[in-house]
Each structure stands twice: as structure tokens, then as C-alpha cells.
Amino acid sequence: MLLNEDTGIGNYHIQAYDAESVTINKILYTSSMIVSPYILIPEWKPKSLEDLKAEHFQSVLSLNPEVVILGTGKKFIFPPQEKLMLLLQKRIRIESMDTGAACRTYTALISEGRKIVAALIINNNS
């Protein structure tokens, strides 16, 4: 799905997504990633929600977000609370949704100038 909104805010804009990829700044990514308006971390370790561990959010914490959008893959799966403990302990708001919805939400929130980070799981095996 194409996203038309280019807010001009930040350096990293999600332009499109489908079940197996996300396009940011005209580059197609096919693996999990962390993206914020000013930092992109491709090749984020978890390949599925089952792979996700609390310590995977260490790099998210270093970005000091007010909101983290967790894209759980092709389908929304509610993540167990223990996987989110690092964020919960720092009182960082977490919104979990399927990765497509996370891409749309990221685009909407950066247009508002919010300090957000999207942690997107892209699982090409299911």
C-alpha cells in the first residue's frame, strides 16, 4: 500500500508497505527494523513476535521516544508483557498493531511532530 503523506518532518519517511516489505525513502526493506524520524536501524534482530526479547528494545530506548509503535508482523498478536518490560519500566507508551497499521500510524504521528519510534517486525516466512 502506498502512503502519500510526506510531512517534510525528519529524514525517514515510510512511503509504502506490503506483507513482506517496507519502503523508506525509496529503498525497499525486507527485514525487521527500527525507524524514527531521524534514525533508521535496519536488520533489527527479531524476525517474528516469538523471537522478540525485552533486550531487543535497548536500541529503542536510546532514541528516547515518547511513544513506541510495535508492528507485530502480518497479523496483530498481543505481545506478552515481559517482552515489553524495558519500555514499561521507563513509562514509555507502547502501541502494538500489525505492521501495516504501524506504518500508517508512524506516518500520521510524525506529521504531528511526535517523538516516536516504530519497531517493525517483517516476517517473510509465514
Located regions from the model:
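Non-catalytic interface/targeting segments
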Residues: M1-L52, Q58, L63, S111-S126
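Short active-site-adjacent helix-start/loop capping segments
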Residues: P42-E43, F76-P79, T105
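Mid-chain, well-packed structural core segment of small domains
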Residues: V60-S96
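Short acidic loop-to-helix transition motifs that present clustered carboxylates
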Residues: T99-R104
